[in-house]
Amino acid sequence: MATDDTSVSGVAGRYATALFELARDQKSIDAVRADVDKFAALLADNPDLVRLVRSPVFTAQEQGKALDAVLTKAGITGITANFLKVLTANRRLFAVNDVIRAFRALVAKFRGEATADVTVAEPLNDKNLDALKASLKSVTGKDVDLNVKVDPSIIGGLIVKLGSRMVDSSLRTKLNSIKHAMKEAG
């Protein structure tokens, strides 16, 4: 397995571990990580691609043909492209987001980094991302890789999950706290 204390499980964990070990053996972790990030960005920006990935209506051949076109246009080649094709052929493309998350965790562990899941109401600019990374690095003593998710329902602020710790400074949570306090008071 990848590293003894890195916990990945289930289908996504097995596929992520296979991708990580292949990338490590080929000494191309950085290139594979960049391609994985590029594919994740495509998923985040393209609802049609998400539909293709998640829908059981499409056959493996239809998914494969469409995926080939997407990968070619995005410039994703080599290990990552072949890996995504294997996911497609094995009818596991629906799990690609979990595979990406597990792969990123394996890479972070390998590099001695920590991974934080961050939920924000609006996308963060580079200055804010750098400030958040610096703040989390001061807490953990490690470089921190961010998995940022945009969720407008938190209204403002952010939610950070780092390992077993979570800090919720979202406006939604603060408003709910005020609401409960007012109910108790009156």
UniProtKB/Swiss-Prot annotation:
TM helices/strands, residue ranges: none
Keyword Nuclease: no
The organism's place on the tree of life at top rank: Bacteria
Keyword Transcription regulation: no
GO molecular function: proton-transporting ATP synthase activity, rotational mechanism
Record-level GO cellular component terms: plasma membrane; proton-transporting ATP synthase complex
Record keywords: ATP synthesis, Cell inner membrane, Cell membrane, CF(1), Hydrogen ion transport, Ion transport, Membrane, Transport
Membrane-topology annotation of the record: Peripheral membrane protein
Protein location: Cell inner membrane
Listed InterPro entries: ATP_synth_OSCP/delta_N_sf (IPR026015), ATPase_OSCP/d_CS (IPR020781), ATPase_OSCP/dsu (IPR000711)
HAMAP family in UniProt: ATP_synth_delta_bact
Subunit structure: F-type ATPases have 2 components, F(1) - the catalytic core - and F(0) - the membrane proton channel. F(1) has five subunits: alpha(3), beta(3), gamma(1), delta(1), epsilon(1). F(0) has three main subunits: a(1), b(2) and c(10-14). The alpha and beta chains form an alternating ring which encloses part of the gamma chain. F(1) is attached to F(0) by a central stalk formed by the gamma and epsilon chains, while a peripheral stalk is formed by the delta and b chains.
Family, per entry: Belongs to the ATPase delta chain family.
Its job: F(1)F(0) ATP synthase produces ATP from ADP in the presence of a proton or sodium gradient. F-type ATPases consist of two structural domains, F(1) containing the extramembraneous catalytic core and F(0) containing the membrane proton channel, linked together by a central stalk and a peripheral stalk. During catalysis, ATP synthesis in the catalytic domain of F(1) is coupled via a rotary mechanism of the central stalk subunits to proton translocation.
PANTHER family with a match to the protein in the record: ATP SYNTHASE DELTA CHAIN
Stated name of the protein: ATP synthase subunit delta
Source organism of the structure: Afipia carboxidovorans (strain ATCC 49405 / DSM 1227 / KCTC 32145 / OM5)
Annotated gene: atpH
